[in-house]
Each structure stands twice: as C-alpha cells, then as structure tokens.
Design a protein with these regions (language model features):
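Structured, hydrophobic secondary-structure cores that serve as assembly/anchoring elements
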Residues: 1-261
C-alpha cells in the first residue's frame, strides 16, 4: 500500500512477535515509522526499555483508561492508537518536523498507572516515551524519542522529517525517466530540489538563518561516475540540517533517466 507513513498494530505490546514484525516491516520498507507500546503488565520502571534498538519506531508507556461507549465501563487499552492520532493531528497542524510531544491525549479517562518525574528521568533517556497526567493540564505525551541508541536519530520528529524529505524528493523527481542524462537535466533537478527544500526551510523545518546553512544539493560529475551517466543513472547528494545550522544529515537519491536501458 503506497503513502503509508505511520504503522501501529494495536495488539502488539511489549516484547512480542507482532512488535518485532512491526519493527522489521518499517526497517525493510525504509519509508514509514512504527509506534510501539509497553505490555499491560509492564510496571517495573527499573527494567522497562524499548523491545528493539531501532530508529524506525518509538516506544510508549503506560496503557490508558478509556470509557467504553457501549457499556459505559472504564477499560484499559494500549496507547498506540491514541499516539497515532496525535502524530496525525500534529502533522496536520504543525508539520512533520514538530515533535509529537506535550500533546493532550484526547478521549481518555486516566492512565493505567501514574508516572512520576523520577520515573520520567529514568525512562526517557532509555527511549521510553511516557504518557503523564498533569494537574490542570490533562493527560499528555511527554516524550518524543525514537527507540534508537544512535544520537543522530534520537528524536521522532528528526527521523520522520528525514523520511518525509527523502520520499518527497524521490517522488518529485520521477519525471527524469523521460529525459536525457546530461548537464541540463542535472541543473533542472538540482533547482527543483532546492526550491522544495527552500519551502521546507521557510516553514521552519530546517535550521539556519540562510538556505546555505539549512541544506545543500549536489547533482553533477562528483555524484555520478561516467558509467552512471552512460547507463542513465542520475544520482543526487543532499544534506539537510534538521537540528543545528550547517550540521547536515546527508543522503542520496537516484533515478533512472531516459538514457537507461
């Protein structure tokens, strides 16, 4: 199914096989982000941690209490569905570059068990995103870390912004399949990508006081070999600064042009 950006399996909790399937799927597809959740009985803060070290998912705790609209009874549910809704709401309101944290969890009565400031200080560095109840402020998601130990991909919004940028650029340059692989095409592709990234920077998603501090785009003989050019393979190198000006996360995209066999 195309255009999926978030994956959440409501029945996948804790360190079970379905959770592992979600992580494996997101890592293999490399264009979507998973929402993982603690098990219902996971209450030992000292031993709680994400079930996998991955930058393609985030882990949430604890379960939530909701009122069943049919019976009127309060039931406990895993947090993944509500968190997925918060992702979608934040994306629509602010953009994918905004961290889905300090967001009110709507439609819940309470959290399954209280999460203290001390719990937060233990769990957050491990990549456990806590859901907490604050007097007068409601129940909120109080963390936006991925389940990764890699500092580059520590935060959900940075990882998801990168996925969004790469996917958008790949989709927005598919037209090159009809074009000859020459310097004129490289200049057009470079300008197309720069125009897109300038819009992203102006929206506040990239850091830097100038576009040069926020991103760079290369599409020339330094990014392609003669063999690439002759075989119709166009390669661009792109750097973006999602957290600090001029500190670039670099990636490459490639497309087949009209010169490909």
């Amino acid at each position: 199914v195309p255009d999926i950006s978030i994956v959440c399996a409501p029945d996948a909790t804790g360190d079970d096989g379905l959770t592992a399937d979600v992580v494996e799927h997101c890592e293999e597809m490399d264009d979507r982000f998973g929402i993982l959740q603690a098990g219902r009985t996971d209450s030992d803060v000292g031993n709680l941690s994400p079930p996998a070290d991955t930058d393609m998912a985030a882990f949430y705790y604890p379960w939530l209490k909701v009122r069943n609209p049919e019976t009127g009874l309060v039931e406990e549910v895993p947090p993944g569905g509500h968190v997925a809704g918060i992702y979608a709401r934040s994306d629509a309101s602010h953009g994918v570059h905004k961290a889905p944290a300090n967001e009110v969890v709507r439609g819940v009565v309470d959290i399954q068990r209280p999460v203290t400031k001390g719990d937060q200080e233990v769990l957050n560095p491990r990549g456990v995103n806590c859901i907490r109840s604050f007097r007068g402020r409601g129940i909120r998601v109080w963390g936006a870390r991925t389940a990764s130990s890699n500092p580059q991909w520590r935060y959900v919004n940075v990882r998801r912004l990168f996925l969004f940028l790469r996917g958008s650029i790949e989709q927005g340059t598919q037209w090159v399949v009809f074009e000859p692989n020459n310097e004129e095409l490289w200049a057009r592709v470079k300008q197309t990508i720069k125009n897109f990234l300038t819009d992203v920077w102006e929206d506040g998603a990239l850091m830097g006081s100038t576009p040069e501090e926020a991103f760079f785009v290369k599409c020339d003989r330094t990014t392609m070999t003669q063999s690439d050019i002759e075989n119709g393979r166009l390669i661009c190198e792109i750097g973006v600064a999602p957290t600090r000006p001029a500190e670039f996360v670099i990636f490459r995209i490639s497309q087949w042009t009209g010169d490909s066999n």
